[in-house]
Amino acid sequence: MRVLLIEDDSATAQTIELMLKSEGFNVYTTDLGEEGVDLGKIYDYDLILLDLNLPDMSGIDVLRTLRVAKINTPIMILSGSSEIDTKVKTFAGGADDYMTKPFHKDEMIARIHAVVRRSKGHAQSVIKTGDIVVNLDAKTVEVNGNRVHLTGKEYQMLELLSLRKGTTLTKEMFLNHLYGGMDEPELKIIDVFICKLRKKLAASAHGKHHIETVWGRGYVLRDPNEQVNAA
């Protein structure tokens, strides 16, 4: 999961970054609202964490600017203010959630997962695709009731495929999701990850493959039950 953190207090930013990275998130930080707006427009994040008190512009202005620009990335506000008026303004401006500092790590992680799930159209923390069950909170995968042990990169790919089930994802999208533009390997590494992921899933799925290759475009995760119904 890719998170943009817009926070001007370096100590707070470092603490949040460590919290999220310990959960396997890819975190990108900036202490300026204007830069946060630019990054939010250019890159595809799963979530934006936004502080309200920034040195160059208010967090509410950052929020409104992103929404006016039709950026639909979920935005969670981080603020030391518990004032109702402030909360009302942020929700009216397009915020998806609001957390008051200081906050507990477990609550923050749970809220992040909930907001991202809703943004992808999933109200529950478990996504089922045929025999495959992905638990987004526990970061576990089961096939036919059997636990499948995946590497971090393999899990991130399956999570992305599950969240965007039925949508063809390009190799560039996978690469951006896994590495976020930092020390990215060649595109062919995605084929290697997909091959390994397919083998692990098929071993518990009686040889069935749920990840399809869309030649010249990328890969897609399809629910076999939906295909049967469509037929």
UniProtKB/Swiss-Prot annotation:
Transmembrane segments: none annotated. GO terms for cellular component: cytosol; protein-DNA complex. GO terms for molecular function: DNA-binding transcription activator activity; DNA-binding transcription repressor activity; phosphorelay response regulator activity; sequence-specific DNA binding; transcription cis-regulatory region binding. The keyword DNA-binding applies. Residues 2-116 form the Response regulatory domain. The keyword Transcription applies. Phosphorylated by CckA. The modification 4-aspartylphosphate is found at residue 51. Keywords: DNA-binding, Phosphoprotein, Transcription, Transcription regulation, Two-component regulatory system. Forms part of a two-component regulatory system CtrA/CckA that controls multiple events in the cell cycle, including cell division, stalk synthesis and cell cycle-specific transcription. Binds to a group of cell cycle-regulated promoters critical for DNA replication, DNA methylation, and class II flagellar biogenesis. This is Cell cycle transcriptional regulator CtrA. It comes from Caulobacter vibrioides (strain ATCC 19089 / CIP 103742 / CB 15).
